[in-house]
Every structure is written in structure tokens, then in C-alpha cells.
Amino acid sequence: MATRNLVASLLCIMYAVHAMNDYLYIVKHVKVCNHDYENYCLNNGTCFTIALDNVSITPFCVCRINYEGSRCQFINLVTY
């Protein structure tokens, strides 16, 4: 779960601090998943990978509206 929180924080920084060196560092390390993770995200979620160190590649999902969970496996029926 800590990895997911780190990824969420990094993505927030990526969008909020787009003109700083931190943004460039993050963009270099976040990529759309390759075929190894083709079916990793469920319900049409988009898979990305992030290199957390020189060796580890961690996949994560960005879910479509009304879906949530680490792999977009849960439907969120709450409407706002």
C-alpha cells in the first residue's frame, strides 16, 4: 500500500509541478505498460509502470470513472 501512496504522490507532483526538475525526473520514470502487463488493469483501466529504483518496475492503474482499486477491480456506485 505504501507503494501505491508513493505513486499517487508522484503523479500529483507530476501534474502540479510541471515546470520543475522533479517533473522531468518523474516523467522519465513513468511509462505506459508494455505487453507484459497487458491485462493488469481491469475495466478498461490504463496501466502505467514506474521505476522506483534501478531494478524495480512497479505497475499501477489509472481507473476510468466509477471504478477504483489497485487494479480497477471495484465499481463505485456513489454519484456526486
Curated annotation (Swiss-Prot):
Cell inner membrane found in the keyword field: no
Domain annotation EGF-like: ranges: 29-73
Pfam families, A to Z: EGF
Gene Ontology molecular functions: growth factor activity
Organism superkingdom: Viruses
Keyword Secreted: yes
Signal peptide: 1-19
Subcellular location: Secreted
Main location class: secreted
UniProt-annotated glycosylation sites, renumbered to this chain: 44, 54
Keyword terms: Disulfide bond, EGF-like domain, Glycoprotein, Growth factor, Secreted, Signal
Disulfide partners: 33-47, 41-61, 63-72
Any single GO CC term annotated in Swiss-Prot or TrEMBL for this entry: extracellular region
Protein's recorded name: Growth factor
Lineage: Viruses, Varidnaviria, Bamfordvirae, Nucleocytoviricota, Pokkesviricetes
